[in-house]
């Protein structure tokens, strides 16, 4: 079965009670102000069709979903051995901002989708790009076909004011020789990436390349190679949802990436990308209603990569 507006609308109504069950991220003050009852879903097919329900057009802070975009940019700038010598490909099983594992593993982050891994990727972008923050913004605008997408400067400033732990992660990696630039400028870029403000529709369109062997459905241009697309989806399936990746694979069965802003993107390779948003989170930092919505959609349209 194909996804339809009626299917999405029925799922939204079914999962709506969960919006009052989770907890909105409060360690970033600007995120804590987002109403917990927001709920949206968008599907973007490889034929270019957009199907939506709920608050799918409303922009929100994409947070860690941006880590996939940073990795995609880095894949185009570095040879695989260069890239993967500085960050691993394994699930962490720890909190996304853990220092303990990083210390034990001598400054090499487990994967690019936890904070340490994404900060290393931003360090790598800083080494190869003259203006990485502007390049990322142009990249997202191009992939989505939406030139008005921007950074939420209030969120970025809020994160920078509460950046002690991420700074500690960066300095710890630098002490092991796995950080090559000044810490503060790299953190500024990292927080701006997290503060990208996008809607479910914009996210689903942006990540269409992961459902289409590395080619953007929006632009028709090759973003990454088919092999890199497959590898990225493999990492999303194993590492994309913090320490809830196994639960998500079990329930939803799609490569995915979440953010503490309540967004999740999911990929059905060869067919479609899906974006959901509901700010109330579970204990792993993943959207409670969003995960359930994706689980129901996967069941109703009969899709899973497994």
Curated annotation (Swiss-Prot):
It is an enzyme of class 3 (hydrolase). Homotetramer. Keywords: Hydrolase. Signal peptide: none annotated. Belongs to the glutaminase family. It comes from Vibrio cholerae serotype O1 (strain ATCC 39315 / El Tor Inaba N16961). Substrate binds at residues 64, 115, 159, 166, 190, 242, 260. The gene is glsA. This is Glutaminase. Its EC number is 3.5.1.2. It catalyses: L-glutamine + H2O = L-glutamate + NH4(+). Gene3D superfamilies: DD-peptidase/beta-lactamase superfamily. GO terms for biological process: glutamate biosynthetic process; glutamine catabolic process. GO terms for molecular function: glutaminase activity.
